[in-house]
Amino acid sequence: MRQTKTGILLANLGTPDAPTPEAVKRYLKQFLSDRRVVDTSRLLWWPLLRGVILPLRSPRVAKLYASVWMEGGSPLMVYSRQQQQALAQRLPETPVALGMSYGSPSLESAVDELLAEHVDHIVVLPLYPQFSCSTVGAVWDELARILARKRSIPGISFIRDYADNHDYINALANSVRASFAKHGEPDLLLLSYHGIPQRYADEGDDYPQRCRTTTRELASALGMAPEKVMMTFQSRFGREPWLMPYTDETLKMLGEKGVGHIQVMCPGFAADCLETLEEIAEQNREVFLGAGGKKYEYIPALNATPEHIEMMANLVAAYR
């Protein structure tokens, strides 16, 4: 019997190619055109997106990207490439490709890269620890479209999420412990997850339950009392209600109530990006301190740390 050759596809959201209005506009147009992200009627959404949102948001968002841009590109791209390279070194006999739902490198280029290595089985690992239709679902949709155009289709193992994976929880816990050791134990550990519209959850997306699972498991691993750990949701967009409580409003409230020291972690982000480095580490720090808080630290994402790479290797091993 011929031995199966397996490849690994690491999938993430994507990023603009440059911190310029033009590049950001191209990226946002692709991102906000996906029905998994915004499912508003196209008759209403297209004019709003093209006539208002893209012209107004692109220059502002480009400035935010410029504030966190790294020598090798956006933080998400730099850390994602590091993850790909480190996992390939950890699994030298297994091709590892990186693909993004939006922007470059595309998911299609990642699939083609693996097929060029003559793999007949692909393990797809969306780097979203907590499932959501708007993230993991978008990877699934695009993968299906890509394979629909192929004459030969490899076997596919698709990892839905890993919200309560033991290695993942331990890696988070060790990162928190290191931060506590460096900065002192805070009055509160705030876990901020990317939000989604409340309507998506009402219609069946189990994302909030998966976030609660991670929060519960992490608090347990740390041995922290429930009242010392709080879960919030960030990065809301548009006018409809999103998952609550909102991170920025919660930080303002906590500062006003006299909570002095907070540390913030974003467990749903496998790699640091604009939403963590600018929104959480900078904007929300100003919100908390401006409301009366005294001390605020952001705990970095797991990025390409050895513990994170080992977690990925162990996670995909069950599907190889």
Curated annotation (Swiss-Prot):
<comment type="subunit">
    <text>Monomer.</text>
</comment>
<keyword id="KW-0627">Porphyrin biosynthesis</keyword>
<comment type="pathway">
    <text>Porphyrin-containing compound metabolism; protoheme biosynthesis; protoheme from protoporphyrin-IX: step 1/1.</text>
</comment>
<dbReference type="GO" id="GO:0006783">
    <property type="term" value="P:heme biosynthetic process"/>
</dbReference>
<protein>
    <recommendedName>
        <fullName>Ferrochelatase</fullName>
        <ecNumber>4.98.1.1</ecNumber>
    </recommendedName>
</protein>
<keyword id="KW-0479">Metal-binding</keyword>
<comment type="function">
    <text>Catalyzes the ferrous insertion into protoporphyrin IX.</text>
</comment>
<keyword id="KW-0456">Lyase</keyword>
<dbReference type="Pfam" id="PF00762">
    <property type="entry name" value="Ferrochelatase"/>
</dbReference>
<keyword id="KW-0408">Iron</keyword>
<feature type="binding site">
    <location>
        <position position="194"/>
    </location>
    <ligand>
        <name>Fe cation</name>
    </ligand>
</feature>
<comment type="similarity">
    <text>Belongs to the ferrochelatase family.</text>
</comment>
<dbReference type="InterPro" id="IPR019772">
    <property type="entry name" value="Ferrochelatase_AS"/>
</dbReference>
<dbReference type="InterPro" id="IPR033644">
    <property type="entry name" value="Ferrochelatase_C"/>
</dbReference>
<dbReference type="GO" id="GO:0005737">
    <property type="term" value="C:cytoplasm"/>
</dbReference>
<dbReference type="InterPro" id="IPR033659">
    <property type="entry name" value="Ferrochelatase_N"/>
</dbReference>
<keyword id="KW-0350">Heme biosynthesis</keyword>
<dbReference type="GO" id="GO:0046872">
    <property type="term" value="F:metal ion binding"/>
</dbReference>
<dbReference type="GO" id="GO:0004325">
    <property type="term" value="F:ferrochelatase activity"/>
</dbReference>
<keyword id="KW-0963">Cytoplasm</keyword>
<dbReference type="InterPro" id="IPR001015">
    <property type="entry name" value="Ferrochelatase"/>
</dbReference>
<feature type="binding site">
    <location>
        <position position="275"/>
    </location>
    <ligand>
        <name>Fe cation</name>
    </ligand>
</feature>
